[in-house]
A protein has these predicted regions:
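Buried hydrophobic positions in well-ordered alpha/beta secondary-structure cores of metabolic enzymes
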Residues: 18, 54, 77-78, 102, ...
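Conserved small-residue-rich beta-alpha loop and adjacent elements
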Residues: 1-41, 47, 75, 83, ...
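Conserved C-terminal structural/oligomerization subdomain of aldehyde/semialdehyde dehydrogenase
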Residues: 199-340
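Solvent-exposed alpha-helices and their adjacent loops that cap or buttress functional pockets
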Residues: 15, 46-50, 68-72, 78, ...
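Short hydrophobic alpha-helical runs that function as membrane-insertion/retention elements
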Residues: 20-24, 78, 97-99, 107, ...
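A glycine-rich helix N-cap at a beta->alpha junction
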Residues: 41-56, 279-281, 286, 291
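A structured beta-alpha segment of the ubiquitous adenosine-cofactor-binding alpha/beta core
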Residues: 55-74
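ALDH superfamily catalytic-core signature
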Residues: 8-9, 13-20, 86-216, 338-339
Length: 340
C-alpha cells in the first residue's frame, strides 16, 4: 500500500521520536521503497542524525521479515501490508501497531453538492493512481442524481465500462483464486489497465467505472482495487445507499474508512452511526481526508489503524506519539477527596 509515501512517513515519525527504524519491504516495491528510504536517510544524516538511523533489508523475503520482527533488538513493530503479515507482527510477542485493508464506500446522497462531490472523488481516486488504502472503492449514487453524476464524470475524463468490458476488467483486475487484487495493476494508470484487460478507452481516461448489482465474492470489482478502477452502484433510497455502503465496509474493509457527500445532517449522522469504520469522511476526498490535516483536523498520517473492527490495536492515525514511552512521576499531593 502506497510504499514510497508510507516509507517516508514511517521514517519521519521514527526519527522525530528518536527511534531508529529498519524496513522489510514488499519484494514488489523493493526498489522504489529503498530509494524513498535513502532520500530520507541522506537528509537526516546531513542534518546531524546518526548514520544508521534508517535501514532496510537489501534482499527481501518473508523469512527475512519474520527474522527482523522477532529479533530481540526490535522493540516495536509497525505493520503495514496484508492481513497475514499484520497477524505475524502481532504474534511476535512485541508491541505491534498493525493496520488493515480498506474497502471504502463513497455514498453520494441527493442532497450533496454534486460538482464538489465529483471533483473530490476524482481528486482522491487519481491521487497516486488509487494506491492509498483510504481511496474510494465504490461510488454509491442516489438514483435522482445518477444521470447528472455520470455526465459530470464523463465530462472530466472518466469511463463507464459496458457489461462485456466489466467482465474483462473483473477477470484482469482481480485474482479469483486468491480473492484479491492482481498486484500488477496496483498504482497503474487507468489507460494502461484498460489496454491490458482488452478494453478500449479514450486517451487520457482517468478512472474506469464498473456498474455492479451487488457486493461480495460474486462481484470481484466490489473488492479493494488499489488502482483507478471504481465500482459503481445506483440506489433508490437513502436506506439502500447506507446499506450498500455498509456491505462494502463489511467486505474486507472493516474498521478502515467510509466517505459520504451530503448536506442533510440527519443522513450524515445515520451514515456515521451505521458504518463500522474508524474514519468517516464528510464532503471531502477520501484519500486526503483519511490521511488527515488537509481537509480536517485529523492527525496527519499514512498509517491508518482499523481498531478492533479490523483486528488492529489502534483505531486512529498512527503518528509520532505512538512511538514514545511516557514517564509519569506521581508525587504525593492532596487531591480531590472523592471518598473519606
Amino acid at each position: 500500500t502506497n510504499p514510497t509515501s508510507s516509507t517516508m512517513f514511517k521514517s519521519l515519525i521514527s526519527v522525530k521520536s528518536r527511534n531508529p527504524i529498519i524496513f522489510g519491504f514488499h519484494p514488489g516495491a523493493q526498489k522504489c521503497s529503498a530509494a524513498a528510504a535513502k532520500i530520507v536517510l541522506d537528509a537526516a544524516v546531513a542534518a546531524g542524525a546518526p548514520e544508521n538511523c534508517i535501514q532496510w533489508i537489501e534482499y527481501p523475503s518473508i523469512e527475512a521479515t519474520n527474522a527482523l520482527m522477532n529479533h530481540p533488538g526490535v522493540a516495536t513493530v509497525l505493520a503495514t501490508g496484508g492481513s497475514g503479515m499484520v497477524k505475524a507482527a502481532y504474534s511476535t510477542g512485541k508491541p505491534a501497531l498493525g493496520v488493515g485493508p480498506g474497502n471504502v464506500p463513497c455514498y453520494i446522497h441527493k442532497s450533496a453538492d454534486l460538482e464538489q462531490a465529483v471533483n473530490d472523488l476524482i481528486l482522491s481516486k487519481t491521487f497516486d493512481n488509487g494506491m492509498i488504502c483510504a481511496s474510494e472503492q465504490a461510488a454509491i449514487v442516489d438514483k435522482a442524481i445518477a444521470t447528472k453524476f455520470e455526465k459530470l464524470m464523463k465530462k472530466y475524463g472518466c469511463y463507464f465500462a459496458k457489461p462485456d468490458e466489466i467482465k474483462k476488467l473483473s477477470d484482469y483486475c482481480i485474482d479469483s483464486e486468491k480473492g484479491a487484487v492482481n498486484p500488477v495493476i496496483v498504482g497503474k494508470p487507468a489507460t494502461w489497465i484498460a489496454e491490458q484487460a482488452g478494453v478500449k478507452v479514450p486517451e487520457g481516461t482517468k478512472i474506469l467505472l464498473a456498474k455492479l448489482d451487488g457486493v461480495g465474492p460474486e462481484y470481484p470489482l466490489s473488492r479493494e482495487k488499489l488502482s483507478p478502477v471504481l465500482a459503481y452502484f445506483i440506489v433508490d433510497s437513502t436506506e439502500e445507499g447506507i446499506d450498500r455502503a455498509e456491505e462494502m465496509v463489511m467486505f474486507h474493509g472493516m474498521g478502515h474508512s467510509a466517505v459520504i457527500h451530503a448536506n442533510d445532517e440527519d443522513v450524515i449522522q445515520k451514515y456515521a452511526a451505521t458504518m463500522k469504520a474508524s474514519r468517516l469522511i464528510v464532503n471531502s476526498p477520501s484519500s486526503h481526508g483519511a490521511i488527515g490535516d488537509i481537509y480536517n483536523t485529523n492527525m496527519p498520517s499514512l498509517t491508518l489503524g482499523c481498531g478492533s473492527y479490523g483486528g488492529n490495536s489502534v483505531s486512529g492515525n498512527v503518528t509520532t506519539v505512538n512511538l514514545i514511552n511516557q514517564k509519569r512521576v506521581a508525587k504525593r499531593r492532596v487531591n480531590m477527596q472523592w471518598f473519606k
